């Protein structure tokens, strides 16, 4: 099992690593978003360093890259993310909050905060899922709060379902 050291920092789109910012801007252009930068509620970047690498896993899955970079951007309607591993080109994706199942939690198996996402990706008809990980510091928690606020605004009071009563209680 690999051990990781994660560092998350809040930043602006212009303060992201250049390859991540470029991937996000290219994604926004493909989606025909004209003023998405004005809609940014929060932005963060996480650097993950592999401290101990499982050699067998690295041979099978190619997970031996020492550094991985992740950028997350929260807007009022969607979550946008980009990642790059090692010296590879960054890739970006996004999804509307209304088209995703999003769970933000602290995994038992590792320290930090995780975003479990299952969503229909913007620009495709495909649904995909995955886990994005941040550290457990105050800047990561602040970003999670912004996402939580944005998603709560989309839930109408009538959409909140009452808890089920079990066994007639």
Regions found by a protein language model. Give the residues of each.
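Phosphoinositide-binding peripheral membrane targeting modules
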Residues: 52-114
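Canonical phosphoinositide-binding patch of PH/PH-like domains
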Residues: 121-145
């Amino acid at each position: 099992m690999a051990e990781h050291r994660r560092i998350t920092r809040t930043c602006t789109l212009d303060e992201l690593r250049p390859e991540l910012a470029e991937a996000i801007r290219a994604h926004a252009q493909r989606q025909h978003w004209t003023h998405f930068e004005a809609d940014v509620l929060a932005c963060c970047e996480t650097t993950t360093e592999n401290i101990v690498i499982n050699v067998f896993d690295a041979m099978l899955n190619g997970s031996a890259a020492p550094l991985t970079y992740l950028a997350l951007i929260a807007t009022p309607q969607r979550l946008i993310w980009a990642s790059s591993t090692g010296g590879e080109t960054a890739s970006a994706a996004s999804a509307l909050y209304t088209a995703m199942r999003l769970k933000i939690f602290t995994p038992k198996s590792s320290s930090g905060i995780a975003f479990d996402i299952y969503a229909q990706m913007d620009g495709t008809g495909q649904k995909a899922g995955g886990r994005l990980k941040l550290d457990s510091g105050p800047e990561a928690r602040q970003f999670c709060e912004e996402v939580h606020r944005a998603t709560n605004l989309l839930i109408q009071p009538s959409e909140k379902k009452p808890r089920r009563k079990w066994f007639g209680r």
